[in-house]
Design a protein with these regions (language model features):
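Anion (oxyanion) recognition and catalysis
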Residues: 11, 37, 122-126, 155
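Conserved N-terminal subdomain of the carbohydrate kinase-like
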Residues: 16-104
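Active-site beta-loop-alpha junctions enriched in small/polar residues
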Residues: 77, 105, 136-140, 166, ...
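Glycine/threonine-rich flexible loop motifs
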Residues: 106-115, 143, 171-173
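Conserved phosphate/ATP/ADP-binding segment of small-molecule kinases
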Residues: 127, 141-215
Length: 220
């Protein structure tokens, strides 16, 4: 998912990376594990669900055709990952990590993944790791109000924050220009870096992408 994209990119830059997840102990789980390895990412923190009904969460992406937008259908409820327990991973992981990254998709999947992720964030932070978080809001997984309430619980621990301009306005009810919006997050929370994507939609298949980063000198 989104987190694997991030650690795969970091691995390409020569960093040692790993991913925390729970996979079904079957052929699909083995395939997913091998794809993780293929990306140069360690599978040391993958755990396995040995139940007979264990399943791998999937989603379906449908391309858009003007004027209809692309759409995504998630089929991830009751997936093995939604049953992950932090006692399944070694405690040594927290002290051996320089940066922990997760996203709003993980928080939105289930109440269990939400609470496990929040607890892990606190433990990584207590051991001195940087916390990186991407809102990655998905309206078909949870509402804006649910996302805002949950994410505001973890923002006091976040060092690097990814949030699109649209999400900042619609979910966090921010106002002003992009710089003012990004700066406001660093004023309200001890966030060092805010990164935002900027997208201009020309058609369902043609988008122009840009990005902007706000660096807070207060929290460096």
């Amino acid at each position: 998912g989104a987190e694997l994209n991030v650690v795969s990119g970091a691995a390409l830059l020569g960093l040692r990376t790993g991913i925390i997840s729970k996979l079904p102990d079957n052929s699909l789980g083995i395939y997913a594990k091998n794809r993780v390895r293929f990306c140069g990412v360690s599978d040391d923190y993958l755990v396995y669900d040995k139940e007979e009904d264990a399943r791998l969460g999937i989603y379906f992406y449908e391309n858009g055709a003007y004027p209809r937008k692309p759409s995504v259908v998630y089929d991830r409820r009751h997936a093995s990952f939604c049953k992950i327990n932090e006692t399944e991973v070694p405690d040594s992981m927290y002290a051996n990590t320089a940066c922990f990254h997760t996203s709003g998709i993980t928080l939105a999947l289930s109440e269990n993944t939400r609470e496990v992720a929040i607890d892990m964030i606190k433990k990584f932070k207590a051991q001195g790791a940087l916390i990186s978080f991407d809102v990655n809001f998905r309206g078909n997984l949870w509402t804006g109000e649910e996302a805002k309430e949950c994410i505001e619980r973890i923002l006091p621990y976040v060092d690097i924050f990814f949030c699109s301009e649209d999400t900042a306005r619609l979910t966090f009810l921010k106002e002003g220009n992009v710089k003012e919006i990004m700066k406001s997050f660093t004023e309200e929370y001890p966030i060092s870096i805010v990164a935002s994507t900027q997208r201009i939609v020309h058609s369902p298949k043609v988008h122009t992408f840009g990005s902007v980063i706000y660096l807070s000198l207060i929290h460096i």
